[in-house]
């Protein structure tokens, strides 16, 4: 009850600031979006989960928040020439303690700013293997399993029940309002891979529409987007979702773990939208590699955000199909560094540095 009262007070405070009848801002024009992109330079970086965190809860809750490791890893990212990291938030951590969550998020932003890095902030995602996620001590990593305890946010039950979206609205509006003019935020990724309906989620599109509306009411200086995870076919039931995303995002984001030819085909499909393009997930060896994909992304000035930095608790370096007890693979799937900071492949690291230009400094 205390938590609900606190969240209600937060929403009323936001409403008083914004005005109850405030009309949502409109989608950015092509000219505004492209002018924004021209100011950024080439966007390059990684999807980031702290190596000591098994999921979003462990990354952000007070008991396990690990700024020392974050600082160390952001130093490695800076050394690669990365200027961006994409992070995933936790509604459970925020709702339990909005003030504490925001204090830790602010500390994280201070760390990345120190290393000349900006954040892509992701709110919701339908992917996850952790059943009934709860605050406190998190389940242990399962040896041999890729991303064994990742959390759906906010989860199937909440996504499918609009009466429970009130707390989500509070979170979205509070965080975006706080950072709406903050240069440390590159852009807002409101819903990760909304095409993903494999875990019983039925109201992704309605929730995504509402989340965009909440964000538009705040009208941040940073663009809004949601990434598509594959080229849609004429037979996909997700076409309404894909169409809505591409017609309402300020910038176009997408994911691609397939071969370089497919990546270039995907990019060419999106170019007619005449909006900035950012690939917010790629690089899954052996099909999608830095050496083959980074030059294509840079050629078209498409933002390049590979998945993973350090092979930590999440086991991102293992294949999606890995099973409990599987041995360490000779060929990593994601990630760049081992826990001690040594590269999985020095040749890859040298290539990344060449592509980002830091090898010439």
Predicted regions, residues:
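Bacterial Sec-dependent N-terminal signal peptides
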Residues: 1-22
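Active-site mouth of glycoside hydrolases
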Residues: 23-249, 255, 260-262, 273, ...
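Conserved catalytic-core segment of NTP-binding enzymes
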Residues: 266
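Catalytic His-Asp charge-relay segment
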Residues: 276-278
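Catalytic histidine-centered segment of alpha/beta-hydrolase-like enzymes
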Residues: 316-318
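Catalytic domains of carbohydrate-active enzymes that cleave complex glycans
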Residues: 350, 354-361
């Amino acid at each position: 009850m205390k938590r609900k009262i606190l969240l209600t007070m937060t929403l009323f405070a936001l409403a008083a600031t914004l005005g109850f009848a405030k009309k949502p801002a409109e989608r950015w024009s092509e000219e505004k979006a492209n002018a924004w992109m021209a100011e950024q330079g080439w966007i390059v970086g990684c999807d980031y989960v702290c190596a000591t965190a098994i999921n979003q809860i462990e990354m952000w809750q007070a008991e396990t928040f690990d700024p020392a490791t974050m600082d160390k890893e952001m130093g490695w990212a800076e050394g690669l020439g990365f200027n961006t990291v994409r992070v995933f938030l936790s509604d459970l951590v925020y709702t339990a303690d909005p003030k504490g969550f925001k204090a830790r998020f602010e500390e994280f932003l201070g760390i990345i700013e120190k290393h000349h890095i900006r954040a892509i902030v992701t709110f919701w995602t339908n992917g996850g293997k952790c059943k009934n996620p709860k605050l406190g001590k998190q389940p242990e990593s399962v040896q041999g399993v890729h991303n064994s305890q990742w959390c759906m946010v906010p989860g199937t039950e909440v996504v499918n029940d609009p009466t429970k979206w009130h707390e989500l609205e509070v979170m979205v509006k509070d965080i975006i309002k706080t950072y709406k003019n903050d240069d440390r935020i590159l852009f807002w990724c409101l819903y990760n891979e909304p095409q993903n309906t494999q875990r019983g989620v039925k109201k992704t599109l309605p929730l995504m529409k509402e989340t965009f509306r909440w964000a538009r009411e705040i009208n941040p200086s940073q663009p809004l987007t949601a990434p598509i995870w594959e080229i849609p076919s004429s037979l996909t039931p997700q076409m309404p979702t894909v169409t809505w995303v591409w017609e309402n995002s300020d910038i176009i984001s997408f994911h691609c773990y397939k071969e370089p030819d497919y990546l270039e085909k995907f990019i060419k499909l999106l170019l007619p939208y005449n909006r900035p393009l950012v690939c917010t997930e790629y690089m899954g060896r052996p099909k999608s590699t830095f050496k083959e994909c980074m030059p294509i992304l840079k050629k078209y000035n498409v933002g390049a955000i590979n998945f993973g930095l350090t092979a930590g608790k999440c086991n991102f370096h293992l294949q999606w199909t890995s099973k409990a007890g599987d041995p360490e693979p000779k060929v990593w799937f994601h990630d760049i560094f081992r826990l001690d900071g040594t590269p999985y492949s020095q040749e890859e690291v040298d290539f990344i540095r060449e592509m980002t230009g830091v090898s010439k400094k």
